[in-house]
Design a protein with these regions (language model features):
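Short hydrophobic/aromatic beta-strand immediately N-terminal to the Walker A/P-loop
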Residues: 7-9
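P-loop (Walker A) phosphate-binding loop of NTP-binding proteins
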Residues: 13
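Conserved lysine of the Walker
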Residues: 18
C-alpha cells in the first residue's frame, strides 16, 4: 500500500449533500483527487426485465458488489489503475462501459453505505458523514431523480417509502458512528468557515 495516498470516505443518506461536499474538496485539491462512487458498484441484473429491476431494493448492502469495490480500492492504494464499472440509473443496471481510474494523492470514496462494510471502511483514512434533515434529503432526491434519472414523482415517492427510508434507518444512520467527522446540515454551515 502507498502510504502517501489519503483515502477519504464520504457517506450519508440519499440527497444529504455528499456530492456537494466531494466537489468542494476536489476544488480545493485540484488535480490531486480520484473519485470512486459506490453507486457504480450496484450489482448487474441482465437476467431481469426493466420492470423487475425497478422493483429491487437498491438501498441495502446486498444491492452492491462491495467486494469488487474493496478490491479496486486496494488496487488504487497499491498505485495501480482500475476499470471501474458504470451504473446507469435510467435502466437500473450497469452499462457495458467502464471508467479508467488512476490513483492520485487523494482518493475519495463516496456512497450511502460505504461505512456499513467493515472491510471497505478500514481502507479509509478519514470517514466523513454528511448529516442532513430527512425532509431536505427527500426534496433533493425527488428533484434529482425526476430531472436527471427520468423517474416519475410517484415512483420516487414509492421507492422512498418502501426502501429508501427504512434502509436509511436500518443501515445508513447507524453507520454514522464510524465517522471521524460528522458534517451537519449537509455541510451548509461548514463551507462558510473554510
Amino acid at each position: 500500500m502507498d502510504d502517501n495516498i489519503l483515502v477519504i470516505g464520504i457517506a450519508g443518506g440519499t440527497g444529504s449533500g455528499k456530492t456537494t461536499l466531494m466537489n468542494n474538496l476536489i476544488s480545493r485539491c485540484e488535480g490531486m483527487v480520484t473519485v470512486i462512487s459506490h453507486d457504480n458498484y450496484y450489482k448487474r441484473h441482465d437476467d431481469m426485465t426493466y420492470e423487475e429491476r425497478s422493483q429491487l431494493n437498491y438501498d441495502e448492502p446486498a444491492a452492491f458488489d462491495t467486494s469488487l469495490m474493496v478490491y479496486h480500492l486496494e488496487e488504487l492504494r497499491r498505485g495501480h489503475a482500475i476499470e471501474c464499472p458504470v451504473y446507469d440509473f435510467t435502466i437500473h443496471n450497469r452499462s457495458e462501459q467502464t471508467i479508467h481510474i488512476v490513483p492520485k494523492k487523494v482518493i475519495i470514496v463516496e456512497g450511502i453505505l460505504i461505512f456499513e462494510n467493515e472491510e471497505l471502511r478500514n481502507l479509509m483514512d478519514i470517514r466523513i458523514f454528511v448529516d442532513t434533515d430527512a425532509d431536505i434529503r427527500l426534496c433533493r432526491r425527488i428533484k434529482r431523480d425526476v430531472n436527471k434519472r427520468g423517474r416519475t414523482l410517484e415512483s420516487v415517492l414509492k421507492q422512498y417509502q418502501d426502501t429508501v427510508k427504512p434502509m436509511h434507518e436500518r443501515y445508513v444512520e447507524p453507520s454514522k458512528k464510524y465517522a471521524n467527522i460528522v458534517v451537519p446540515e449537509g455541510g451548509k454551515i461548514w463551507w462558510r468557515w473554510t
